[in-house]
Amino acid sequence: MPGVSAHGLSCEERRQLAVDLTRVLALYRSILDAYIIEFFTDSLWGTLPHAWQEVLDGLNPPELATLLLGMPREGEEIRYRSVWPLTLLALKSTACALAFTRTPGFHTPSEFLENPSQSSRLTAPFRKHVKPKKQHEIRRLGELVKKLSDLTGCTQVVDVGSGQGHLSRFMSLGLGLMVKSLEGNKRLVARAQRLDQELLQALDKMEKRHPKMVQRSPRHRPHHVVQWVSPTTLCEELLLPLEMPGQSSTRLLLTGLHACGDLSVALLRHFCCCPEVVALASVGCCYMKLSDPGSYPLSQWVAGLPGHELPYRLREGACHALEDYAERLQKAGPGLQTHCFRAALEAVIRQVCPELRRPGVQGIPRVHELKIEEYVQQGLQRVGLDPQLPLDQAALQAHQAQENRVVAFFSLALLLAPLVETLILLDRMLYLQEQGFYAELLPIFSPELSPRNLVLVATKTPLGQAFSILETEDS
């Protein structure tokens, strides 16, 4: 899916993009605000223009992926079987034109061509206990942090929200960086320390077996600290330097791999407020967990725009995986019926218990093997209602017959969702810009592997042409 490159936009172009985004989101807010499980209870199909209904009603899932989402199969031509209304074509074009591009400088991650479970770019010890998605992420972000550290003269990297320490471990023991690793969950910290020791032992064995292949250099394991980081107050532990002989001053680089909700905002505020922090590389996620107000909007510019508000539902939608859903549409598998079944269940729940709205239904296993009435019965039991209630079979079959409409409406919302993410990240760039700093966004991960793939890179002095080094894939 094409889009606008965040890198290289002037300050004025960034402001204008924010204006355009707020206008478009206000125009289509009814689609973004909708809950797909209320498709039948709120007659969501009827909220679409009649001309849109006519066009979308005739599309099967692969056609929705190709024609609406603009994600055809490799080598597939985009051909419309009918004339689409200009308003729908305008929506599609606008959604593509205003969203930050999520396509990195490489297409298929070459590291997984030989084995989809093992990155060929990481040695076996660094792959152990790490899923393929995380292997890709720690390698790509770790290498970017290493380059950024070299460019800005950083003496120490602080990995905030480090979890089990996979990124910290790769940066310190794989790339030779001095790393402090902050994580609020003490059990995760204890596991990270065990994995550190396990990796050190594996590297020692490898060095003994292949002394010429392994670089002999001092190994600095990550320094793990149990520490919660608040989005509103400065964390002294984050700023404390590691004791290193011969070091006269501390220059910190903050990083976070999918720093959840307010944690990404905390990194920005520490970067802005603390002179010892000279660089930032942050990949955010879980936008629905942002405090409101306080964590969005951050910039004065976006705060002053009419229609800038992003309620919970919009921020939640921005966390969906567009590329993954497009692939599911292309395969047209039975799993696509889940939204339709859940919407049918919601309609039954409202009939039985009108005050019970959108209750959480814990995952019902093997939905694709169930009949719609079986799904509804299991769902009723999960929300504390009688699963043996008499069901209107004709109504359920009528709902199931609209499965493609449910999928089409959800696809429309997904088409718009990247605009919400773009506005959130653009607001962060504008905030840093208003503080007098320099910020860029780069698509760093393959979006098929890691949907939240935009890294916010910030520095206190301009990098100029040197910034292009961060965009390249190491050979």
UniProtKB/Swiss-Prot annotation:
The chain crosses the membrane at residues 406-426. GO terms for cellular component: membrane. Residues 185-210 form a coiled coil. It is found in: Membrane. It holds the Pfam family Methyltransf_32. Its main location: membrane. It is a single-pass membrane protein. Keywords: Coiled coil, Membrane, Transmembrane, Transmembrane helix. SUPFAM superfamilies: S-adenosyl-L-methionine-dependent methyltransferases. PANTHER family: CGI-41 METHYLTRANSFERASE (PTHR12496), METHYLTRANSFERASE-LIKE PROTEIN 25B (PTHR12496:SF2). Belongs to the METTL25 family. This is Methyltransferase-like protein 25B.
